[in-house]
Amino acid sequence: MMKRQFEDVTRIVIKIGTSSLVLPTGKINLEKIDQLAFVISSLMNKGKEVILVSSGAMGFGLDILKMEKRPTNLAKQQAVSSVGQVAMMSLYSQIFAYYQTNVSQILLTRDVVVFPESLANVTNAFESLISLGIVPIVNENDAVSVDEMDHATKFGDNDRLSAVVAGITKADLLIMLSDIDGLFDKNPTIYEDAQLRSHVANITQEIIASAGGAGSKFGTGGMLSKVQSAQMVFENKGQMVLMNGANPRDILRVLEGQPLGTWFKQIEEVRHD
């Protein structure tokens, strides 16, 4: 049996999706955000370095503007996200402050990490914030990012963004919170006999084929993007845990080595009992 060893993990990227932050009613999940802030603050107090990649700008914007569904018009989508981003960061700042943890905002577009000079600048920004004991909260800059063939600046979704952030910050571990327990061998919402994969050492065609499906009405990420993100993590010699975000305190259990979710780690690096 492969044992998870996270004792030496110092720098952690945690990604939380819209489905974990916004209730099915469209209202903000205040309890979840409070739990997340508590966990991250606890980790910071223990000497860990934590970067939070947070979706939710669209969900927050829809709630504030009392809109029931995402606009189809791109300009309106960007406007709603812009409103929601301010509200989301305001709430994060208030709740983290209760736990005496300071946060900052970093909004990225894909072109920032493509060009060496801007990549160096954003890397330095991360390092400076971390050295000051601040939790960077990262999101895609939805108000200005586009997905045009001649000038693509979108990452696609925040699953991929979290993998990019983990790579450029040389994080020891990416923890991806989802609305599902991990990666299954088939869709658990359709097949009752679906089995959770506890460990994935390689992203095979079989795994890619079984990871179909889209995201929620508030978010964009599906299981396929999570698998593709794991592949990006592997390319950077990193590791990732995909787990259910229903109880953020489970992050602490994962770091203790408990076998929750799916652990993505290349097999040549796995330690055995």
Swiss-Prot record:
Top-level EC class: transferase
Compartmental location: Cytoplasm
Family in the record: Belongs to the glutamate 5-kinase family.
Lineage start: Bacteria, Bacillati, Bacillota, Bacilli, Lactobacillales
Keywords: Amino-acid biosynthesis, ATP-binding, Cytoplasm, Kinase, Nucleotide-binding, Proline biosynthesis, Transferase
Residues annotated for substrate binding in this entry: S55, D142, N158
Role noted for this protein: Catalyzes the transfer of a phosphate group to glutamate to form L-glutamate 5-phosphate.
One BP term from GO: L-proline biosynthetic process
Main location per the UniProt record: cytoplasm
Name of the featured protein: Glutamate 5-kinase
Pathway: Amino-acid biosynthesis; L-proline biosynthesis; L-glutamate 5-semialdehyde from L-glutamate: step 1/2
Biological source species: Streptococcus pyogenes serotype M1
GO MF term set: ATP binding; glutamate 5-kinase activity
Gene name, Swiss-Prot/TrEMBL: proB
Catalytic reaction equation(s): L-glutamate + ATP = L-glutamyl 5-phosphate + ADP
Glycosyltransferase keyword on record: no
